[in-house]
Amino acid sequence: MKPVSRGMVLKILSAVMIVMAGAAGYALHSMRWLPWQKPVFDKAIPANCVAATDKAILIFSKTNGYRHASIEAGVKAIKEAGQKRGWEVVATENGAYFHEICLKSYRAVAFLSPTGDFLTDEQQRAFEQYIENGGGYAGIHSAADCEYEWDWYGTMLGTRFRSHTFLPYPIPKAEIVTEPGLHPAIDGLPARWSKKDEWYNFHESVRGKSGFQILLTIDESTYPAFWPKAMRGDHPIAWSRSMGKGRMFYTAIGHNASTYSDPTAMRHIMGGIAWAAALN
């Protein structure tokens, strides 16, 4: 048997180190919150938090963990699209907006890729009352990957983020399937359409859960679902439900800034926000 050369040993060791570094990087990235990151909570109620009109939407994008570079593009696009619809659109990263005085002046709150824990117990209760009394919620992308200790929030969503596409294809192009049915978030969308994104896997599908309407699914056969394995079949990525007198809409798309210049994606997002706000 021919002895292994020193060069070959070094190549093998390098490959092993790369794999280990990748696994460690994935583990840290999947945490979306790191032990040395301390949540910052806002407690002083802003003096100007009340909306000026009765067609107001609040965009909330506070990050106490990983921050998506697409947030600024998302805020800009939603503001512009909302204003064309005659809405007042206010954007904030101040958790103190989650107070009865502020919240009741908005038709819906859009959680635009927030991460970590960002609301106090009192602010969480204020939001729960807001939704149950008729307010709207629209969650975008990592809105399913935050506030893990808030049980009510997880119940509202119906499931939680588990993992997402990673190396060697972190942002693959995949085909999205528009589910049959009527809903402003899918009105006018193609039956199938392609998009690049960071595709989320969830702990479970919300299909079949009482009150949930699936809006979009992803065809797992159209993108490389290596490790971590995707959801092995039925893979919803957008859905809605009524909760109390309120409405919730969630879509997993939105990791990339390009989402917010994509007419099909924006039609979906704005339709979902409009439905949540009862402005459709």
State where each predicted segment sits.
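Catalytic beta-strand/loop cores that center a nucleophilic Ser/Cys/Thr
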Residues: 42, 167-244
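Helical hinge/lid and interdomain linker segments adjacent to catalytic or ligand-binding clefts
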Residues: 11, 59, 69-147
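Solvent-exposed loop/turn segments at secondary-structure junctions
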Residues: 63-66, 95-98, 114-118, 137, ...
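Aromatic-Pro/Gly-enriched surface loop or interdomain linker
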Residues: 17-105
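Extracellular/periplasmic catalytic domains that process cell-envelope and extracellular macromolecules
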Residues: 50-54, 83, 101-105, 120, ...
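A glycine-rich, often tryptophan-bearing local segment used as a flexible ligand/cofactor-contacting loop or short
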Residues: 117-189
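Extracellular ligand-binding/catalytic regions of CAZymes and related secreted enzymes
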Residues: 11, 26-52, 80-84, 221-224, ...
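N-terminal Sec-pathway targeting helices
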Residues: 2-20, 29
